[in-house]
A protein has these predicted regions:
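Membrane-interface junctions at transmembrane-helix termini in multi-pass inner-membrane proteins
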Residues: 27, 157-187, 208
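Transmembrane-helix boundary and interhelical linker motifs in polytopic inner-membrane proteins
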Residues: 19-29, 59-62, 77-115, 134-140, ...
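Interfacial/gating helices of multi-pass transporter permease domains
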Residues: 55-76, 107, 207-212, 246-257, ...
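Helix-terminus/linker motif at the lipid-water interface of multi-pass membrane proteins
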Residues: 46-64, 135-139, 200-202, 265-287
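Interhelical loop/hinge segments that connect adjacent transmembrane helices in multipass membrane
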Residues: 12-30, 207-211, 225-269, 273, ...
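Small-residue-rich midsections of specific transmembrane alpha-helices
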Residues: 45-51, 68-96, 112-122, 159-165, ...
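Hydrophobic alpha-helical transmembrane segments
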Residues: 182-232, 249-253, 284-287
Length: 287
């Protein structure tokens, strides 16, 4: 028997209204987040197409191809952080749903430490095996090898910073702050557009300069993610801990998506490298 004055099927009307209000708020949040993501995607897509055209004009076909294929070597190992990102978002979102912010902090701290280790390992692999492959196997003109090596070193450092970004991006997405995510993505795109214009104004080796400026842009965006998370999510703080059980859970969950991410990465970048081995940098510029 329902004790409330107004009941529908034995359920208090007040509870129904609360549920409807919560559902309405959720729908509004989903719609707003979707709008932010679509705006981000469209703006980034448009600006990137325009930026690529400018960079191609400034660098020339050969240097543009060198940058693409050198960056492709670095990007081959990007599947590791991509697969971990999905795992981190899952654990952060689960603990947030339980309002257990202590465990959210622990999961975030573990994720940050894991990605720090991944960044170091990936950079070491690239600076050893990657350098050998670039020098001995890739088809790059002799007079552009020094510039290609400069781009490679900058790309390796940028890769390390990009890997460290992943836990902060996962935290923003877990909090459903898509506006912040969209704004930082737009700033990143604008920085790359500014770099494209700067290339034509600075009298220096354009290929090496482009690699260095792209590294600076990656560092700036990484710092932006760190500052935004520090200021916006005060209940989440880094803890210097090591939870073996949580480490196992994160890596096991990530292993399910690692194979797909690896296949996708090798499909995109592996073809680029194979094209270079057989046809040279001009074909890489067209790929």
């Amino acid at each position: 028997m329902c004790l409330s004055r107004w009941c529908i099927g034995g359920v208090s009307v007040s509870y129904v209204l609360i549920f409807m209000s919560a559902t309405s708020e959720n729908n509004k949040r989903i719609a707003k987040n979707t709008l932010f993501l679509y705006m981000r995607m469209l703006l980034i897509m448009g600006v990137t197409l325009y930026t690529s055209r400018i960079v191609l004009q400034v660098l020339g076909v050969e240097d543009f191809g060198i940058y693409n294929v050198v960056g492709g070597i670095v990007a081959l190992l990007g599947f590791i952080s991509s697969s971990m990102s999905i795992s981190i978002q899952r654990f952060l979102s689960y603990e947030m749903g339980r309002k257990n912010y202590e465990k959210v902090s622990r999961a975030f701290s573990m994720a940050l430490q894991i990605h720090g280790i991944i960044a170091v390992v990936v950079m070491m692999l690239l600076e050893t095996a990657g350098i050998y492959f670039l020098r001995c196997k890739m088809v790059i003109p002799i007079d552009r090898m020094d510039s290609a090596l400069s781009v490679f070193h900058c790309s390796v450092l940028a890769c390390g910073f990009s890997i460290v970004q992943v836990p902060f991006i996962a935290l923003i997405i877990a909090y459903e702050r898509m506006g912040l995510y969209a704004y930082i993505g737009i700033v990143d795109t604008m920085l790359k557009l500014a770099i494209a214009f700067l290339l034509g104004w600075i009298a220096y080796d354009s290929l090496a300069l482009y690699g260095g400026l792209m590294l600076v842009a990656t560092i700036v965006i990484t710092l932006a993610y760190v500052m935004v998370c520090h200021l916006s999510f005060k209940e989440i703080r880094y803890q210097c801990i090591w939870d073996t059980r949580l480490f196992g859970s994160l890596t096991r969950f990530a292993s399910w998506s690692a194979l797909g991410e690896m296949a996708w990465g090798f499909t995109l970048q592996g073809v680029n490298i194979v094209l270079n081995l057989f046809f040279g940098t001009v074909v890489n510029a067209a790929y």
